[in-house]
Amino acid sequence: MASSNLIKQLQERGLVAQVTDEEALAERLAQGPIALYCGFDPTADSLHLGHLVPLLCLKRFQQAGHKPVALVGGATGLIGDPSFKAAERKLNTEETVQEWVDKIRKQVAPFLDFDCGENSAIAANNYDWFGNMNVLTFLRDIGKHFSVNQMINKEAVKQRLNREDQGISFTEFSYNLLQGYDFACLNKQYGVVLQIGGSDQWGNITSGIDLTRRLHQNQVFGLTVPLITKADGTKFGKTEGGAVWLDPKKTSPYKFYQFWINTADADVYRFLKFFTFMSIEEINALEEEDKNSGKAPRAQYVLAEQVTRLVHGEEGLQAAKRITECLFSGSLSALSEADFEQLAQDGVPMVEMEKGADLMQALVDSELQPSRGQARKTIASNAITINGEKQSDPEYFFKEEDRLFGRFTLLRRGKKNYCLICWK
């Protein structure tokens, strides 16, 4: 991405929701590299898909020659951002937040280049400047510059104040001041002149711009990326099992890959613009090819490959594709023990069983069948496979060789109904 028209290119991809003084920012970018930042609060032990667009936006700026600062909120994570939240957040302990800070910092690291000369990325933690600040300094040096009248009129806060059942604590109300001071600190320390974030962060970003101007007399800018929505109106980044996480221990690479494979046709080309580094021309060509092929579109597979490789690397992608292919073909010989562990984590329904169980009981316990009687009929009709092999004997008891790696047996009813037995 060329730096001179970077904002225009981001807009073409649908990646700009709001921007302050767009003309002045474009001029500043045209003058040469800048430093910019995006903040990630440790509200859990992993980032999720909602964090991916701003994180990739940092990467896009770095590829254009700019210096990204990834700020993990060791201090703000102790307070909690009230922006557009229906209720007060639960406060986590300092030990928990510090543990999450470490995990998120490691998670962010692979997306950015921390060793590439002038525009090497920087990892920062706002606990470094808030940890030892006393309340008098906070009120005199920061609080003095904020108008309560303006703060309560910010949309993110106003929504909470207007709810009869929920007010807002002073703790969460002060969050806006903390994030504003982050921008001022990073401007002074690293020359940061741009903050990016989700569109729900607009109020916090503009507060930081105003505070930086008051404290340092510097012009700085803000840019928000849109909160991603799906064409059918349902929430993006959620499955029946909850959020889709970037940590492979919370969402396996296989499950992550499948999430993208299941993208609706109405969303897929837009998501390619948001979540990949393919050019607009390549995405448009793929859309045209899919439209004229008369076959199932390729776009979902391209999207799943690109994003899974970005988040989980080549090894994670190949494991996800291998598991997908084996489940589709019914042949499990290519699967490793680690692949089965992914399936047990969240890939297919899983049931734990004691050794010595029979097939009918396994079908009932796994909820592949409602009763032993129904299980008997289904087995006899040749609709059950064990590790890809048909089994039509209703009196079948599992053998040692059915336990792959001594631990796993994969049952299938029909073509698509799976359950993984994990032997105790």
Curated annotation (Swiss-Prot):
Q: What is the effect of changing residue 37 to V?
A: Confers specificity for the non-natural amino acid 3-iodo-tyrosine
Where is the motif 'KMSKS' region annotated in this sequence? 235-239
UniProt short sequence motif 'HIGH' region, positions renumbered to this chain: 42-51
**Can you name one GO molecular function term for this protein?**
ATP binding
State the top-level EC class.
ligase
What is one Gene Ontology biological process annotated in the Swiss-Prot or TrEMBL record?
tyrosyl-tRNA aminoacylation
Give the catalysed reaction(s), semicolon-separated: tRNA(Tyr) + L-tyrosine + ATP = L-tyrosyl-tRNA(Tyr) + AMP + diphosphate + H(+); D-tyrosine + tRNA(Tyr) + ATP = D-tyrosyl-tRNA(Tyr) + AMP + diphosphate + H(+)
Q: Does the keyword Ligase apply?
A: yes
**In what way is this protein post-translationally modified?**
Acetylated at Lys-144. Acetylation at Lys-144 leads to slightly decreased activity. In vitro, in the presence of acetyl-phosphate, can also be acetylated at Lys-67, Lys-85, Lys-90, Lys-230, Lys-235, Lys-238, Lys-321 and Lys-377. Acetylation at Lys-85, Lys-235 or Lys-238 causes dramatic decrease in activity.
Name the residues that bind ATP: 238
Every S4 RNA-binding domain range: 357-414
Q: What are the subcellular locations of this protein?
A: Cytoplasm
Q: How is it used?
A: Utilization for in vivo protein biosynthesis of mutants that charge azatyrosine efficiently to tRNA may lead to efficient production of azatyrosine-containing alloproteins, which have immense potential in biotechnology and medicine.
Activity-regulation annotation = Magnesium is essential for activity. Inhibited by chloride and sulfate in the presence of 1 mM free Mg(2+). When the Mg(2+) concentration increases to 10 mM there is almost no chloride inhibition any more. Inhibited by diphosphate and AMP. Chloride strengthens the diphosphate inhibition and weakens the AMP inhibition. Chloride weakens the binding of Mg(2+) to the RNA and thereby the interaction between the enzyme and the RNA. Acetylation at certain lysine residues could significantly impair activity. D-tyrosine is a competitive inhibitor of L-tyrosine for the formation of tyrosyl-tRNA(Tyr).
- What does the record give as EC number? 6.1.1.1
Specify whether Transcription is a keyword of the entry. no
Tell me the superkingdom of the source.
Bacteria
Q: Which UniProt keywords apply?
A: Acetylation, Aminoacyl-tRNA synthetase, ATP-binding, Cytoplasm, Ligase, Nucleotide-binding, Protein biosynthesis, RNA-binding
- Quick one: which residues bind L-tyrosine? 37, 175, 179
Report the GO terms under cellular component.
cytosol; membrane
Q: Which InterPro entries match?
A: aa-tRNA-synth_I_CS (IPR001412), aa-tRNA-synth_Ic (IPR002305), Rossmann-like_a/b/a_fold (IPR014729), S4_RNA-bd (IPR002942), S4_RNA-bd_sf (IPR036986), SYY-like_C (IPR054608), Tyr-tRNA-ligase (IPR002307), Tyr-tRNA-ligase_bac-type (IPR024088)
Q: Which PANTHER family match?
A: TYROSINE--TRNA LIGASE, MITOCHONDRIAL (PTHR11766:SF0), TYROSYL-TRNA SYNTHETASE (PTHR11766)
Q: Which family does it belong to?
A: Belongs to the class-I aminoacyl-tRNA synthetase family. TyrS type 1 subfamily.
Tell me, how does this one assemble?
Answer: Homodimer. Binds one molecule of tRNA(Tyr) per homodimer.
Function comment: Catalyzes the attachment of L-tyrosine to tRNA(Tyr) in a two-step reaction: tyrosine is first activated by ATP to form Tyr-AMP and then transferred to the acceptor end of tRNA(Tyr). Can also mischarge tRNA(Tyr) with D-tyrosine, leading to the formation of D-tyrosyl-tRNA(Tyr), which can be hydrolyzed by the D-aminoacyl-tRNA deacylase. In vitro, can also use the non-natural amino acid azatyrosine.
| Descriptive protein name | Tyrosine--tRNA ligase
* The species this protein was found in: Escherichia coli (strain K12)
Quote the gene name from the UniProt entry. tyrS
